[in-house]
Amino acid sequence: FNRERLQLVFNETAADLRSIGVECAALVQTNTPLPASVVSVLYDCLYDFATVANAASDAVLMLFVQQDERRVQLRAMLDSSDAESERMATTFDELRASLEKHRVEYSIEADSSSASLVAYVPFPTKGGK
């Protein structure tokens, strides 16, 4: 996935969210094509934050993807007047399990009105491990 294709994926999701009342914007800054395995993890993060944003009132979701030589960083920030705590907790538990399965370094912080994620998705090593 080159930068333009990944930006398109994130922009389409952002547009879908805006159409249902969630303010959303995404910025992708990559300089080389990304492996499908990396994009899959990024999309899981995007989708999980979109799910929480959809259930929240007055939600604002910002997404930023940046690449270095070893990995891709995704930062997601969600603000809301009343994020649905139970749904948020369940969704983030599932996201944590997925990130750990893929050996992704991450930090998720959440309270009743906001949530943030910083995830570092490594490039696959030769041999796919």
Q: What is each of the regions a protein language model found here?
A:
Residues 3-38, 96, 100:
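Helix-loop-beta hinge of the Bergerat
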Residues 25, 62, 107-109:
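Short beta-strand patches within cytosolic ATPase/nucleotide-binding catalytic cores
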Residues 26, 70-82, 119:
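Conserved DxG motif in ATP/Mg2+-binding regions
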Residues 33-37, 81-86:
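Short, contiguous acidic/charged loop-to-helix segments that flank catalytic cores in large enzymes
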Residues 35-62, 67:
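Conserved ATP-binding N-box helix of the HATPase_c
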Residues 47, 51-54, 84-118:
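ATP phosphate-binding glycine-rich loop and adjacent ATP-lid/helix-beta elements
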Residues 60-77, 111-112:
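Short beta-strand/loop element within the Bergerat-fold HATPase_c
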Residues 125-129:
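C-terminal end segment of the histidine kinase catalytic
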